[in-house]
Design a protein with these regions (language model features):
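Serine-dependent carboxylesterase/thioesterase catalytic core
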Residues: 3-7, 14-17, 26-126, 138-141
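C-terminal catalytic-base region of ester-bond hydrolases, centering on the histidine
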Residues: 11, 123-195
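Short, surface-exposed alpha-helical segments at coil->helix boundaries
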Residues: 13-20, 151
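Hydrophobic, Leu/Ile/Phe/Ala-enriched alpha-helical segments that form helix-helix packing faces
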Residues: 23, 48, 186-190
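Structural alpha-beta junctions
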Residues: 24-27, 157-159
């Protein structure tokens, strides 16, 4: 099994240092949010083209990339655990993009963006868990949120397992409880692979 780590927007693969220290190294996918979702996705597909038995561990926007990748290469993917992934998009981005019209990231993460509209159409074919972070609060969002994305957006995709944790958007990558969730889901995929 190949663990593939995909970080969130404006982060780096180093955001997974603690998780990797407990789960082991894997393939680290780094990307630059300024390059645009479609360009980053194409580069990721190219880099994983010959990789089999993929199990994604992805944070926030990284989970949207993982979902698109799993849809494009279903025979290569075993499953995923995503952390704080806003499958319904970041609603605030649809408004902020008018104040930051040159921000490619804001255009890519809103509910009306291509990446989110396409993600909404994807039928998940693999064991897939989103760890929903429910602690935190941003004053820029009216809806209940984890400090960055809304809880509703994290629960948007109905065809995956949702596990709520009392953590915020950033604590989730530093949690032993979350690592246990990942280990259990990974073990289930390994057992299924051996059948």
């Amino acid at each position: 099994m190949n663990l593939v780590y995909i970080h969130g927007a404006s982060a780096t693969s180093e955001s997974f240092n603690y998780i990797r220290s407990k789960l082991g190294d894997g393939i680290n996918i780094d990307y630059d949010s300024r390059n645009g979702f479609e360009n980053n996705l194409a580069e990721m597909k190219q880099s994983l083209m010959n990789t089999k038995d993929i199990f994604f561990v992805a944070h926030s926007l990284g989970g949207i990339y993982a979902l698109h990748l799993a849809n494009h290469m279903p025979s290569q993917v075993l499953g995923a655990v995503t952390l704080s992934t806003p499958y319904g998009g970041a609603e605030v981005a649809d408004y902020v993009q008018y104040f930051l019209p040159f921000s490619r990231l804001m255009r890519d993460i809103g509910p009306s963006s291509w990446s989110m509209r396409q993600a909404d159409k994807i039928k998940i074919q693999h064991p897939w868990t989103n760890v929903v972070t429910v602690r935190g609060q941003s004053p820029f969002m009216l809806a209940h949120n984890d400090g960055v994305v809304t809880i509703t957006s994290q629960k948007h995709h109905a065809d995956m397992e949702l596990v709520e944790v009392e953590l915020n958007h950033y604590e989730v990558v530093l949690s032993d409880a979350v690592i246990d969730i990942i280990k259990k889901r990974r073990a289930a995929c390994v057992a299924k692979l051996k059948q």
